Amino acid sequence: LLGYSRQDKKHRGREPISCRLVFDLLKTAGADRIMSVDLHAAQSQGFFDGPVDHLVAMPVLVDYIRDRFSNQLDNVAVVSPDAGRIRVAEQWAQRLGGGPLAFVHKTRDITRPNQAVANRVVGDVEGKDCVLVDDLIDTAGTIAGACSVLKDAGAKSVTVVATHGVLSGPAVERLKNSGAREVVLTDTVPIPEEKRWDGLTVLSIAPLLASAIRAVFEDGSVAELFDTYPEHHGQGFLFA
């Protein structure tokens, strides 16, 4: 997880673009190349004066969900927690067999951090096993609200999937009480035992990073890895 990656643009006057600052600090500290997983906005890699390997955790997460719903994939609907991540949800739906797609319409108060209100579901989720996908869970307000509106819209179940589990403040309690069948995260952010519960699954991102590092240091062709997506479990990764 790249720190301050969500602050990649100004939402109002006099706000800093902290994501650019972090890249500049890494460059000043001596970094020649950056490798990161699921940046909040892929275009922010342009802030760094040097090569950036933007890895995507989707294959690791998709493999797990495919195995989890192996006998009922035809009933899975992929849901984006907001309109801004609908393209990611489309990629998820494609890799899970082309099932239905939906997103949660929400409004956000830009003067207050981590304040968003989930209003309604756009798309048909009634009777569906919903997979709610996001890049990062911080205070879990958005995700908990999305779970609530999905349940109100008739969803059979909701499984929350995200790459980065920051889990700050009330996040754990919100997720426990959200009604989600399961919360699936990766270990890009260490999750201590006191923030774990029975409904949480944490997947290792180590094989993804190891494969990318090997490609870089053995002078392999990173470009050839961009479209790699094996059909069997446990290997491969994507770049963006």
Residue spans for each PLM region:
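PRPP-associated nucleotide enzymes
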Residues: 1-240
